[in-house]
C-alpha cells in the first residue's frame, strides 16, 4: 500500500501519465478517475510492406512466433498443440503448425515429434518474413499475460490474419 500511495501521489503531481494501452489507463482510472493519463502506442513502423501475398489459397499452415523464455508463450504453444491443434488436424488433414522463437525448451522441442508440428526455433528476419507470407494464419493462443503483444502487432504489420484470445488482443483496440 505504501508504494501504491507513492505512485498515486506522483501521478497527481505529473501533468500526464503515459501508458502502453487503454487497458492500463482503465485500471488507473478504476483506482482514481481524476488522474490525467494517455496511451502511447507501442506499435509504430516507419515503412509499410508492399509485397504481402493476397492469394491466401496459396498459403498453408499456422504460425506462432514468440520467445520461450517468457512463460506465457510456452504455455500458449503447449496448450494449443495439445488441446486445439489435434481438432484442427481432424478437420484439415495435412495442416502444419510452425513454431518460431528463441530459447525453445525441451518440452516445446518434443512437440516436433507430433504429426504436423514443425519446431523452427530461432530464425533469421528473412526466414520469418517468408513464414509470415507463406502461412495462412498466425495463432496467438495466450492464456495469460499483460499489455500490448508485440507478436500481434508484428503479424498485423506483415499482413497476416490472426486468431487470438482476448489476452492476445489486449491493448490493441482494432484486434
Where are these regions (language model features)?
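Membrane-proximal helix-turn-helix segments that form the acceptor-binding/catalytic region
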Residues: 1-17
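Acceptor-binding helix/loop patch of EC 2.4 sugar-transfer enzymes
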Residues: 1-5, 57, 67, 167
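Acidic donor-binding loop of glycosyltransferase active sites
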Residues: 15, 133-147, 158-161
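Short hydrophobic beta-strand element within catalytic cores of glycosyltransferases
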Residues: 151-154, 161-165
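Conserved catalytic-core segment of nucleotide-activated headgroup transferases in glycan assembly
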Residues: 12, 30, 34, 39-134
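Short acidic/histidine- and often glycine-rich active-site loop of Leloir-type glycosyltransferases
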Residues: 166-175
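Alpha-helix capping/helix-boundary segments
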Residues: 10, 23-25, 104-105, 168-169
